[in-house]
Design a protein with these regions (language model features):
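Short alpha-helix plus adjacent loop in nuclease-associated cores
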Residues: 97-140, 194-195, 299-308
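Low-complexity, acidic/Ser/Thr- and charged residue-rich accessory regions of DNA metabolism proteins
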Residues: 298, 338-385
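Short, basic/hydrophobic alpha-helical segments
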Residues: 50-73
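Gly/Thr-rich phosphate-binding beta-strand-loop-beta motif of the actin/hexokinase/Hsp70
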Residues: 9-34, 123
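Short glycine-rich, Thr/Ser-proximal phosphate-binding strand/loop in the N-terminal lobe
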Residues: 26-52
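Phosphate-backbone recognition surface of nucleic-acid-processing proteins
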Residues: 249-349, 384-385
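Glycine-rich, often acidic, oxyanion-interacting loops/wings at catalytic, nucleic-acid
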Residues: 149-252, 381
Length: 385
């Protein structure tokens, strides 16, 4: 796993530093270089041409009066290009930052100029402020290593296939509803035969093309169901036998009652399997569960959670919190929630479950990092060897 991102203010070494900001697009990358003396050089290279980018870096060092061994500090905004460029730059000795684009400050005018060049100049200005020690000018993205990013695709593929499966079922139900038909079971090996036997309200057979549409939709549903079953089996095998860091942590999480193998795998691959956290606030911030206070003059209120982090994890945490109340009723967390919110209304309970989710997240972190089982929680029996 790669080391943590360089801290603000740690990149200026003896004045021999080349700063580089990248504006990435589908066809062309715009590159802006700057030296500590304030000199600048702007160039363009073909997208994904790392060799050409390295040549421009060498040329910029010469033109800006820096030595060939000068350190290079670069940045680009996180987006569709992912993290491969970050790994390529670091493999060539460049200190790179991947920046959360939503954290970059923008003018609040009704209309503002927006061009790639203006964005590039803005990015360079923020980079220079960051290296001077202004850590809060933006948020730096934590980049997973290649293995952690790869194993994360498994849980995301399963989620994507679940969505496709649901859409096919909904489409079939909608087509049948237009004919006044409702079925308890959709799909199956005999789906084509069952479609041919369906009858409208007056006993007549379905139209030829409607039957064809239903059969084709059923075939697509069967393909997705098969792929989904195969990926789930692979996930369960990894959780049971895998030696990767994410698999080991998923296995430990699955020992807790109320957390199934599916949830534990998502927790491990998205959060605990590759990231490290210094404190509870940093942990809660990673999934958008930190508070957002508002205080101006005499007005002061809480605006709710920030929702600035991983949405998948935040959604799953709330689901797990409800499961925790059901399957871990004697735990300290469940008793805390029941004592305060059991007799409140529906809206208050929905708000309160987020508080439980935040406490549960911290408890799971302590369990994985320090082996501290949540107070009163029950563990599942280990399978016999």
């Amino acid at each position: 796993m790669r080391s943590e991102a360089t801290r603000a203010g740690e990149t200026i070494v003896g004045g021999q530093v080349l700063y580089m900001a990248l504006e990435l697009s589908e066809r062309t990358w715009k590159v802006l270089f700057a030296s500590p003396a304030g000199r600048r050089r702007e160039r363009s290279v073909a997208a994904r041409d790392v060799a050409a980018l390295l040549e421009e870096i060498a040329a910029a060092k010469r033109r800006l009066g820096l030595s060939a061994q000068a350190r290079v500090v670069s940045c680009y905004e996180a987006g569709r290009d992912g993290f491969w460029l970050d790994r390529a730059l670091r493999a060539n000795g460049i200190d790179n930052l991947v920046v959360d684009s939503s954290s970059i400050e923008v003018a609040r005018r009704a209309r503002r100029a927006k061009t790639d060049r203006l964005d590039l100049v803005k990015l360079m200005g923020l980079l220079l402020r960051w290296v001077r020690g202004e850590a809060k000018v933006w948020s730096v993205v934590r980049v997973p290593d290649a293995q952690a990013e790869d194993i994360r695709q498994l849980s995301r593929s399963i989620e994507r296939l679940k969505g496709e499966h649901g859409r096919h079922v909904t489409r079939i139900k909608a087509l049948l509803a237009t004919q006044g038909i409702k079925l308890a079971r959709i799909g199956g090996r005999d789906w084509g035969k069952r479609v041919g036997e369906l009858r409208r309200w007056d006993g007549s057979a379905l139209g030829t093309w409607l039957q064809r549409d239903l059969v084709l939709e059923g075939e697509r549903l069967a393909v997705v169901a098969g792929q989904l079953a195969a990926l789930k089996a692979e996930r369960d095998r990894l959780v049971a036998e895998g030696r990767e860091a994410a698999a080991v942590k998923a296995r430990e999480l699955a020992r807790l009652g109320a957390i199934a193998s599916e949830s534990s795998f998502v927790f491990a691959t998205e959060l605990f399997g590759w990231r490290t956290f210094s404190n509870r606030r940093q942990l809660a911030g990673s999934v958008g569960l930190t508070g957002t206070p508002y205080s101006s003059g005499e007005s002061a209120r809480e605006q709710g959670i920030s929702k600035a982090g991983n949405k998948r994890m935040r959604t799953m945490l709330v689901e797990i919190a409800w499961c925790w109340l059901r399957y871990q009723p004697t735990s300290a967390l469940s008793r805390w929630w029941q004592e305060r919110f059991a007799n409140t209304g529906g809206r208050a309970r929905r708000i309160a479950i987020v508080a439980l989710a935040r406490k549960l997240l911290v408890a799971l972190w302590r369990y994985l990092e320090h082996g501290i089982v949540p107070q009163g929680a029950k563990l599942k029996m280990r399978a016999a060897a």
